[in-house]
Design a protein with these regions (language model features):
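Pyridoxal 5′-phosphate
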Residues: 1-401
């Protein structure tokens, strides 16, 4: 199987599995059981993993809360912050949330829930595919205009899971903090694909999923700033009081060990993997463009950089528009003979509606439906890229005939 859907999930690295196996078999103690050796060794493994993961993202160990993944982390960040505000602020005093129209549904849906609970919500648009600005980026002037004295929280996606655009989070953080609001950053797609330092980004809260960087599914983390501008969130789950009371439930020791090892490997391999994945991504684009007349790129230019020299797009991301072809029909054709690709977020891939991200870029519904998303990984090879491009071009030719 040629797998090019690495924004949906990634292959578990064998080295991560090796690190996890002892905690699935011989060392299966509960990290909350301090009365015997098996419990204490499980707790020691969790503590070591917390230190390791914190180092990988530029945090301290006490700023890490282990969760089931970025969706839970985002919900805890957003709903937990809102609950804190509701408990400590007069009604409507700080009950305004700002986010972006191109966020993942792990953010959009809890924000919609807050709106139903009485919070005011502003959803920022982004620069269009054709027009001024970087396609998919938030206009900073729009953010400034959206902020109010009652704004308590802003949530942005560092790296978009569909079009790969990288938001200028450091600039966003300066604006948000000047207004006294809390900034949540969805970092699910970023770790292992770009340098990661949550403190330098200016994030107050940041969410992560292990399975996005070759770790196990079902485990993630929430970064909660405790240095300088320390923030507090209310828990959403109650019971055993684990994770300093912020996330009750028996800790997934094997998963947490796997998360930390996957993050360590992602950071250790960054210098080699970033240029390698960029070269493969560009190779894929060039091969597709040669084989498919009229192919168009969705999102920022592949070689685009901002004024500070920072890339505008994830190195492993490609999103293309195939005119005259329905994306779902093409995917069904490809499913018979590979490669594995998608038309958008895995969390909404069964929806008949076109991608909300592409619609926010200004594409019409037909253009959005005619788009394909590719995500490369450390396991993607040049041979796979070449074969995938040839098969996709052949599939498009059959559908256009």
């Amino acid at each position: 199987m040629i797998y090019l859907d690495n924004h949906a999930t990634t292959r578990l690295d064998p080295r991560v599995l090796e690190a996890m196996l002892p905690w699935l078999t011989d060392h299966y103690g509960n990290a909350g059981s301090a009365t015997h050796e098996m419990g204490r060794e499980a707790r020691a493994a969790v503590d070591a993993a917390r230190e390791s993961f914190a180092a990988a993202i530029g945090a301290t160990a006490r700023e890490i809360v282990f969760t089931s993944g970025a969706t839970e982390s985002a919900n805890l960040a957003l709903l937990g912050t809102a609950a804190r505000v509701a408990a400590t602020e007069p009604a409507a005093a700080r009950h305004h949330v700002v986010t972006c129209a191109t966020e993942h549904h792990a953010v959009l849906d809890p924000v919609a829930h807050l709106e139903r609970q009485g919070f005011a919500v502003t959803r920022l648009g982004v620069c269009p595919q054709r027009g001024a600005g970087v396609p998919g980026r938030i206009r900073l002037d729009d953010l400034r205009a959206a902020l109010r004295p009652e704004t308590c929280l802003v949530s942005v996606l560092l790296a978009n899971n569909e079009i790969g655009v990288l938001q200028d989070v450091t600039a966003i953080a300066e604006i948000v903090h000047a207004h006294g609001a809390v900034l949540h950053v969805d970092c699910a797609q970023a770790l292992g694909r770009m340098p990661m330092d949550v403190d330098a980004l200016g994030a107050d809260l940041a969410s992560f999923s292990a399975h996005k960087f070759h770790g196990p599914k079902g485990v993630g983390a929430l970064y909660v700033r405790r240095r300088g501008r320390a923030v507090r969130v209310e828990p959403l789950v109650f019971g055993g009081g684990q994770e300093r009371g912020m996330r009750s439930g028996t800790l997934d020791v094997p998963g947490i060990v796997g998360l930390a090892e996957a993050a360590r490997l992602a950071v250790a391999g960054l210098a080699d993997e970033v240029p390698r994945m960029r070269a493969l991504r560009d190779r894929l684009w060039e091969a597709l463009a040669r084989g498919i007349p009229g192919l168009a790129l969705n999102g920022p230019a592949l070689d685009g950089h901002d004024a500070a020299g920072r890339p505008l797009r994830l190195v492993n991301n490609l999103n293309v528009q195939v005119s005259g072809v329905d994306g779902q029909t093409l995917l069904a054709t490809l499913a018979r003979d590979e490669p594995a690709v998608s038309s958008g977020s895995a969390c909404s891939s069964e929806s008949p509606r076109p991608s909300h991200v592409l619609l926010a870029l200004g594409l019409d519904e037909d253009q959005a439906r005619a788009s394909l998303r590719f995500g490369l990984s450390r396991f993607t090879t040049a041979e796979e890229v070449d074969t995938a491009a040839a098969r996709i071009a052949a599939g498009v030719a059959r559908l256009r005939a």
